[in-house]
């Protein structure tokens, strides 16, 4: 049985990715899209459109208002919010990280956090889902199993992440112009300044019972898409045990793959809903855990479709497997292993 799905914000990078994925989905039918025209938002019309699910690729501060109105007007529909408006546990924490009051505080705590692999038990039947941030996804997928099993210290975790430029959105900014990005590489919002830190720490506390304070440093790569994150952790066990724990956590996952050998590369994951993880020994009592994903797919639109599938009771992989004709993890890993021998 098919379902009608509407997309708010289809003119942004994430919104366009949603539309592309939905057009290939075997059970979802694209009912309508809204976008913006020369900076003027044109989303109001979507509130009057009947659909079984609504995907909100809107800026934070705006998305919560639409989520609230959709929940009130169409309570049986699934609403997946891809902004940061519903990710944090309190209105106070939202104001701290986003710098303004929440537009729909009554929704806080109602949404299921959409880190699909970690919240699979809560997503079936959910009617309000908060999609994680792209950086948060790259950090949480490796850390949740390791902290939950008490295999690493909860203090002194450093997350060093590099993202393609689409992670900054389509807003016209001088620092995102080609001549500013090309042949350059820069860090921004270092330490505890990036708003994704708040959701990372909140989810780690909720899913693992541990209070973690991350040092997080994001960087902007001169590429279109992809995130490569290096997590520097202090293990309580050897690296082989860390790897086994991650393999056990994701052995039945369609999209999260623990790989041996060289760390994952952006080319392994761009265009897919995959996240690839590898574990390596470090010096001075540390280990390094790498994760790689596509910020627009597993970090945004693909995970939103995955959450929609779970909420609707559809196969989790609908519309996502080989959606871009990308090689499978086995093919890519085998090819690289052959080239390195």
Where are these regions (language model features)?
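Short amphipathic beta-strand starts and helix->beta connectors
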Residues: 38-41, 209-219, 272-276
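Conserved active-site and cofactor/substrate-binding residues in soluble primary-metabolism enzymes
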Residues: 13, 110, 134-141, 191-199, ...
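N-terminal Rossmann-like NAD(P) cofactor-binding subdomain of oxidoreductases
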Residues: 1-190, 209, 280-283, 317-318, ...
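Short Gly/Pro-enriched turn/cap motifs at secondary-structure boundaries
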Residues: 188-192, 219-221, 265-269
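C-terminal active-site/capping subdomain that shapes the small-molecule cofactor and substrate pocket
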Residues: 229-341
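C-terminal substrate-binding/catalytic lobe of Rossmann-fold NAD(P)-dependent dehydrogenases
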Residues: 192-260
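Alpha-helical scaffold segments in soluble metabolic enzymes
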Residues: 17, 141-145, 199-203, 245, ...
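Conserved short hydrophobic interaction patches
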Residues: 21, 25, 73, 203, ...
